[in-house]
């Protein structure tokens, strides 16, 4: 096979082996360049794509290409950058490399005052449970911990609902930086505390010291940036701090409960800067991730939590990690008090009020109302026979949400929409595909989940 066509043939085979989302996100954007008879280089747009493909797909790609080319000696390698122009043989991709523009932390030989990072040393990557809902965010976080200041992810803007692990990941990144660079000036601060710090500086006539302090940081990690809303003077000062850190290649990481453009009463020039780097969502964990979180937390608490009990809890508490941890803490406290084994009956009795509240909060009727309002249609439209795209897509999303967020069976969901269970089953299969293929649908899904989980 002609090596120049080999990559496209490889992609065709990969279509049957990886998800459509992974194919479009990680593999299709790669550019192939034949550099020798037995060597093909795949160019990745940035260090994160390169690292992810190397870890998860390179061995698979090499095997497929060797088989297609009938050449076991064929080598596939990855580089960060852009494929060189064909006529410029000796050109080197002009890329944003760590060695050129990332932060080069220098030890402070005579620091008179110990710098406080305010990082929680218990929040690490090792105890951050990975799932589809946070996989990309965690991968980017790990890369930034190793190479802070990478231009393609500066700033790194992390958004998602309450209790999904944004703060944990923020601390994990900071702790990761310090593990490699102990003298780095890494600061974690909540947006409210930043405002209080500024107010105190103004009151004490110490704004010069305030500005100098923040502009001297190697990495600034600000949690819940949405709290800057309506705080004009805070936004003004943060704008200048942001510019100073950004221009000198210092890492900025921000979290919010919503997408940057959706934060109200924040200056447009700030929101624009929030999107200069990489913006990534953390979504509510899926069932498998919720089970893994419960088992991991139980292990940390030396609890003997049977897997079927973890499934029982995870199937009923779906909104966020904090809710799962709270439920597990209650189960542990009750076991410490009563003794005995933890089984489903024990958990059902211990969590009966929480489970009952969850059933009341998220109902099919509530989902229908929220979806109808979101798409500006009527609830009756969701139950109608209309096949208009403006109705069918919201209807499918509402059905998939009902399956995700309630314990109702497919026939029960179908009856609520005046449909049979096969229609619901089809919606539950199609909506994940839509979310993978269309970012706007994925954004709608995340917004609806946040609204229903609030």
Curated annotation (Swiss-Prot):
Pfam families: Bac_DnaA, Bac_DnaA_C, DnaA_N. It is found in: Cytoplasm. Residues 1-80 are annotated as: Domain I, interacts with DnaA modulators. Residues 336-454 are annotated as: Domain IV, binds dsDNA. Keywords: ATP-binding, Cytoplasm, DNA replication, DNA-binding, Lipid-binding, Nucleotide-binding. It comes from the Bacteria. Residues 118-335 are annotated as: Domain III, AAA+ region. GO terms for cellular component: cytoplasm; plasma membrane. The keyword Transcription regulation does not apply. GO terms for biological process: DNA replication; DNA replication initiation; regulation of DNA replication. Residues 80-117 are annotated as: Domain II. GO terms for molecular function: ATP binding; ATP hydrolysis activity; DNA replication origin binding; lipid binding. InterPro entries: AAA+_ATPase, Chromosome_initiator_DnaA, Chromosome_initiator_DnaA-like, Chromosome_initiator_DnaA_CS, DnaA_C, DnaA_dom, DnaA_N_dom, DnaA_N_sf. The keyword GTP-binding does not apply. ATP binds at residues 163, 165-167. Belongs to the DnaA family. Plays an essential role in the initiation and regulation of chromosomal replication. ATP-DnaA binds to the origin of replication (oriC) to initiate formation of the DNA replication initiation complex once per cell cycle. Binds the DnaA box (a 9 base pair repeat at the origin) and separates the double-stranded (ds)DNA. Forms a right-handed helical filament on oriC DNA; dsDNA binds to the exterior of the filament while single-stranded (ss)DNA is stabiized in the filament's interior. Oligomerizes as a right-handed, spiral filament on DNA at oriC. Domain I is involved in oligomerization and binding regulators, domain II is flexibile and of varying length in different bacteria, domain III forms the AAA+ region, while domain IV binds dsDNA. This is Chromosomal replication initiator protein DnaA. It comes from Haemophilus influenzae (strain ATCC 51907 / DSM 11121 / KW20 / Rd).
């Amino acid at each position: 096979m002609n090596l120049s066509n080999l990559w496209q043939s490889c992609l065709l085979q990969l279509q049957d082996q990886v998800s459509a989302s992974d194919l479009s996100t990680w593999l299709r954007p790669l550019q192939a360049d034949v550099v020798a008879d037995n060597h093909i280089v795949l160019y990745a747009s940035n260090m994160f794509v390169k690292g992810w493909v190397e870890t998860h797909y390179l061995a698979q790609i090499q095997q497929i290409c060797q088989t297609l080319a009938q050449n076991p000696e064929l080598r596939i390698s990855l580089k960060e950058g852009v494929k060189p122009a064909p006529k410029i043989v000796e050109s080197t991709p002009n890329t944003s490399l760590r060695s050129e523009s990332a932060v080069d932390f220098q030890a402070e030989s005579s620091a008179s005052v110990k710098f406080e990072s305010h990082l929680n040393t218990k929040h690490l990557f090792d105890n951050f449970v990975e799932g589809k809902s946070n996989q990309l965010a965690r991968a980017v976080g790990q890369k930034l911990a190793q190479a802070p200041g990478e231009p393609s992810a500066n700033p790194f803007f992390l958004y998602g609902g309450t209790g999904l692990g944004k703060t944990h990941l923020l601390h994990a990144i900071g702790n990761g930086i310090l593990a490699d660079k102990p003298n780095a000036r890494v600061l974690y601060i909540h947006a409210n505390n930043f405002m209080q710090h500024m107010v105190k500086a103004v009151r004490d006539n110490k704004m010069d010291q305030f500005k100098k302090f923040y502009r001297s940081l190697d990495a600034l990690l600000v949690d819940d940036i949405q709290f800057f809303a309506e705080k004009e003077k805070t936004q003004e000062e943060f704008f200048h701090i942001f510019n100073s850190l950004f221009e000198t290649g210092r890492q900025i990481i921000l979290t919010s409960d919503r997408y940057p453009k959706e934060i109200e009463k924040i200056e447009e020039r700030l929101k624009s800067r929030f999107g200069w780097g990489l913006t990534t969502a953390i979504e509510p964990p899926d069932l498998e991730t919720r089970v893994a979180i419960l088992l991991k937390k139980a292990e940390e608490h030396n609890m003997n939590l049977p897997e079927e009990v973890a499934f029982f809890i995870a199937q009923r508490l779906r909104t966020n990690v904090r809710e799962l941890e709270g439920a597990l803490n209650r189960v542990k406290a009750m076991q410490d008090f009563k003794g005995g084994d933890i089984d489903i009956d024990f958990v059902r009795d211990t969590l009966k009020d929480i489970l009952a509240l969850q059933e009341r909060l998220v109902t099919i009727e509530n989902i229908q109302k929220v979806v109808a309002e979101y798409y500006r249609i009527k609830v009756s439209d969701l139950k109608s026979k209309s096949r208009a795209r403006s109705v069918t897509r919201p209807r499918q999303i509402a059905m998939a949400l009902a399956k995700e967020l309630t314990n109702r069976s497919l026939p029960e969901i179908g009856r609520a929409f005046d449909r049979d269970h096969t229609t619901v089953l089809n919606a539950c299969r199609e909506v994940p595909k839509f979310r993978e293929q269309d970012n706007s649908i994925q954004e709608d899904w995340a917004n609806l989940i946040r609204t229903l989980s609030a």
